[in-house]
C-alpha cells in the first residue's frame, strides 16, 4: 500500500499501553481507526484522505512507564520524505529505551526520575538521528527537553495513561 503524505500534519498521537502492546492513533483529538494489521508489526491508518503506515515494536507493562509519541505542528518540507520514518519513531523509541538499557518493568512509577530520563533521552536522540529524524522534543513526566526544534515529542507516561 502506498503511504501518502499530507501537506499539514498536526497532533498525531501514538499511545502504547499494556502487556499486549495495544496501540492507538489520535489525530486532532480523535481516535483514528486502524485499517489493517499485518504480522503484529504494521498498522495502516486513515487520516482524512491519507493512508499512514505506522510500524512499531512494543512490550509495555500496564501500570508502569508507557511510551507515547506525538507529532506536533509541522514537518519541514525537506523532511517530508522521512515522514513514514518519523511515524515509525515508535519503533526506534521502544527499540532503544525498552528495554535493553533499563528494566522498566522492575521500576515503580516514582523511580522514573531525571537521572534515568537523561540517559533515556540521549538514546532517543541518537536513534532518531540515526534514522534521519529531526526536531526531537522529549518529555518525561514534568521535565521537558528540546532538541533542534519541536515536532516530535516522546513522553514516558505513568500507569499506561496519558493526557
Range-by-range predicted roles:
Residues 28-74:
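ATP-binding glycine-rich loop module of kinase domains
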Residues 24-25, 42-47, 86-91, 144:
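Short, exposed beta-strand/loop patches in secreted or surface proteins that constitute
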Residues 54-56, 76-121:
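Conserved structural core of kinase catalytic domains
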Residues 134-163:
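Catalytic activation segment of kinase domains across protein kinase-like and atypical kinase folds
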Residues 1-33:
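Juxta-kinase regulatory segment immediately upstream of eukaryotic protein kinase catalytic domains
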Amino acid at each position: 500500500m502506498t503511504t501518502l503524505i499530507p501537506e499539514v500534519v498536526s497532533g498525531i498521537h501514538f499511545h502504547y499501553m499494556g502487556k499486549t502492546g495495544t496501540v492507538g492513533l489520535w489525530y486532532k483529538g480523535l481516535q483514528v481507526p486502524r485499517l489493517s494489521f499485518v504480522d503484529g508489526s504494521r498498522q495502516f491508518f486513515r487520516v482524512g484522505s491519507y493512508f499512514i503506515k505506522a510500524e512499531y515494536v512494543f512490550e509495555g507493562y500496564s501500570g508502569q512507564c508507557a511510551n507515547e509519541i506525538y507529532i506536533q505542528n509541522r514537518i519541514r518540507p525537506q523532511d517530508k520524505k522521512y515522514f513514514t520514518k518519523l511515524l515509525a519513531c515508535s519503533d526506534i523509541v521502544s527499540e532503544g529505551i525498552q528495554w535493553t538499557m533499563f528494566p522498566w518493568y522492575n521500576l515503580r512509577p516514582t523511580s522514573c526520575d531525571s537521572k534515568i530520563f537523561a540517559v533515556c533521552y540521549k538514546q532517543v536522540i541518537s536513534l532518531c538521528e540515526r534514522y534521519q529524524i529531526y526536531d526531537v522534543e522529549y518529555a518525561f513526566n514534568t521535565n521537558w527537553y528540546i532538541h533542534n526544534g519541536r515536532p516530535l515529542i516522546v513522553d514516558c507516561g505513568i500507569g499506561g495513561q496519558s493526557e
